[in-house]
């Protein structure tokens, strides 16, 4: 029976719950695993761990599966959160969900699942895995492109993908909700989580301020005119419009203000007016810390598509260079607010090839 034993990551949400139910219907021996990956005061206004665990227990009872809780808080702190703080301190805007998937959900969690005698794991991610004719495992977009999460999974390798199931990859999100209601899941109408991976719905600036000091400095236009003061470069990201503190018209223009650049050396935040200001547009990018799903980079000169942020439409591009740990892309059309620290992820149609961290 162990050949059909699968450990499902249960978060308390509807996606992972339906994932467990679908696999049980397919004849798998399903074990549920609830991960606690953040240590905080359970009485915190924003801490949902206790309620999530109660939801998991209720779902497991309805589906008829065993469930256990495991604490990966130490691993998360060392492998994900430390990098998160380093990146923000350096003025970049990291995407912790990408690293969390590679290091926690598909490494620490996978290792624990194997210790339980399982051959595979499953999560409620919207993505697909298939084995190509050459034997390599491919990561593909979900059929429901509006919910596709392959962007967050692009750092998964062959060993991880070969032991992973994504049952929701071929199901529209609307149908997932319908299934949850039809089988009587208590969390069928629970809203989707939108906070940082495992940190929840806390106000982000308040959360970051607990770990990084504020270092106020000048806010300038490209011409060097001081138009305000920022609270610290770590608290802003390229393309940001809200929370800058520059409302109304300036210099006769009614256009909104956007964060355009950060100068760490002078602790200066540069802002511009207008969504399509030249400082917000770029036709090339460089990326490092590369990871390729098949273990090999794309060939220089290859044409494909890239995403530089989640939910962005695929942008046609050309691989200028991909050697060692350096990737350079050239886009057919200028890209808006390409942000250092975020991931540039390459696609060949629906196939996610991998990517790296924008420099």
From Swiss-Prot:
**Where are the active-site residues found?**
100, 197
Q: Which parts of the sequence are annotated with region: Interaction with target base in tRNA?
A: 95-97
The principal location of this protein is cytoplasm
Q: Which InterPro entries match?
A: MnmA-like (IPR004506), MnmA-like_C (IPR046885), MnmA-like_central (IPR046884), MnmA-like_central_sf (IPR023382), Rossmann-like_a/b/a_fold (IPR014729)
Reaction(s) this enzyme catalyzes, per UniProt: S-sulfanyl-L-cysteinyl-[protein] + uridine(34) in tRNA + AH2 + ATP = 2-thiouridine(34) in tRNA + L-cysteinyl-[protein] + A + AMP + diphosphate + H(+)
Q: What does UniProt give as GO cellular component? A: cytoplasm
What GO molecular functions are on record for this protein?
A: ATP binding; tRNA binding; tRNA-uridine 2-sulfurtransferase activity
**GO biological-process terms attached to the record:** tRNA wobble position uridine thiolation
Q: Which domain of life is it from?
A: Bacteria
Is Transferase given among the entry's keywords? yes
- Main EC class of this protein? transferase
E.C. no:
2.8.1.13
Which Pfam family, just one, is annotated for this protein? tRNA_Me_trans_C
Q: Where is this site: Interaction with tRNA?
A: 125, 342
Family statement: Belongs to the MnmA/TRMU family.
Database matches in NCBIfam families = PRK00143.1 (NF001138), trmU (TIGR00420)
Name of the molecule in the record: tRNA-specific 2-thiouridylase MnmA
Source organism per entry reads Cupriavidus metallidurans (strain ATCC 43123 / DSM 2839 / NBRC 102507 / CH34)
- Which taxonomic lineage does the organism of this UniProt entry have? Bacteria, Pseudomonadati, Pseudomonadota, Betaproteobacteria, Burkholderiales
């Amino acid at each position: 029976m162990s050949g059909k034993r699968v450990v499902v990551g249960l978060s308390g949400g509807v996606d992972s719950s339906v994932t467990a139910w679908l696999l049980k219907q397919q004849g798998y021996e399903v074990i549920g695993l609830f991960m606690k990956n953040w240590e905080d005061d359970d009485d915190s206004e924003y801490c949902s761990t206790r309620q999530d665990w109660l939801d998991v227990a209720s779902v497991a009872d309805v589906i008829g599966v065993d469930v256990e809780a495991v604490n990966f808080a130490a691993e998360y702190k060392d492998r994900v959160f430390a990098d998160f703080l380093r990146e923000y301190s350096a003025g970049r805007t990291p995407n912790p969900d990408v690293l969390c998937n590679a290091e926690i959900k598909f490494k620490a969690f996978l290792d624990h699942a194997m210790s339980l005698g399982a051959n595979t794991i499953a999560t409620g991610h919207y993505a697909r895995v298939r084995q190509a004719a050459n034997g390599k495992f491919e990561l593909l977009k979900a059929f429901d492109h509006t919910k596709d999460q392959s962007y967050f999974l692009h750092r998964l390798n062959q060993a991880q993908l070969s032991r992973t199931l994504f049952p929701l990859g071929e199901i529209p999100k609307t149908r997932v909700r319908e299934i949850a209601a039809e089988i009587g899941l208590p969390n069928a109408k629970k809203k989707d989580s939108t906070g940082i991976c495992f940190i929840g719905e806390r106000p982000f600036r308040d959360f970051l301020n607990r770990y990084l000091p504020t270092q106020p400095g000048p806010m300038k236009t490209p011409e060097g005119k001081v138009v305000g003061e920022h609270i610290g470069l770590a608290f802003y990201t390229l393309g940001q419009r809200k929370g800058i503190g520059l409302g109304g018209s300036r210099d006769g223009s009614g256009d909104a203000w956007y964060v355009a650049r950060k100068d760490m050396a002078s602790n200066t935040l540069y802002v511009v007016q207008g969504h399509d200001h030249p400082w917000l547009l770029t036709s090339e990018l460089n990326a490092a810390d590369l990871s390729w799903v098949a273990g090999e980079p794309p060939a220089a000169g290859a044409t494909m598509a890239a995403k530089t942020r989640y939910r962005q439409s695929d942008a046609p591009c050309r691989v200028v260079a991909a050697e060692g740990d350096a990737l350079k892309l050239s886009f057919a059309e200028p890209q808006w607010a390409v942000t250092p620290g975020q991931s540039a992820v390459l696609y060949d149609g629906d196939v996610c090839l991998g990517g790296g961290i924008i420099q």
